[in-house]
């Protein structure tokens, strides 16, 4: 028979917005697990496509989902050119809307995923519609959630952030991050969260 295609945009909104509410988070993860985990769902679901900022949350040692491919800022795989606008796409937009590509690059070239320079689509689209260069990302809820992270008192965190803001690279160990917005044991966990938040 017919099977469904399920699309969940911002799957992680409860993980981010209810960061301190473990009960809501666990109920939500259990809901996702019941919806997608195991072989039974393949009888009625052809494809599930979930978007979000954070990787899929794990409880204990088990992921909420199995039989899925996960692409993240840390491991974009073949999806790297689809996570944002590529440089070629931004050049085409700049040509179509008479924007200085070098200035757009200076403002919005935020990611290097594999071999791709990837731009934040929200920022580029806002530039086209608003007509002015500014930090559109700082007007989002995500921006508000990073301020407490930056202010955490982990040894060397603020120094590393200043180093990155000046254009230099900082090594980050990403293996201990718990894929949530409350479990931070060291500066590497905070920096990993910041990577996922963009």
Residue ranges and their predicted role:
Residues 1-198:
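Phosphate-binding site recognition
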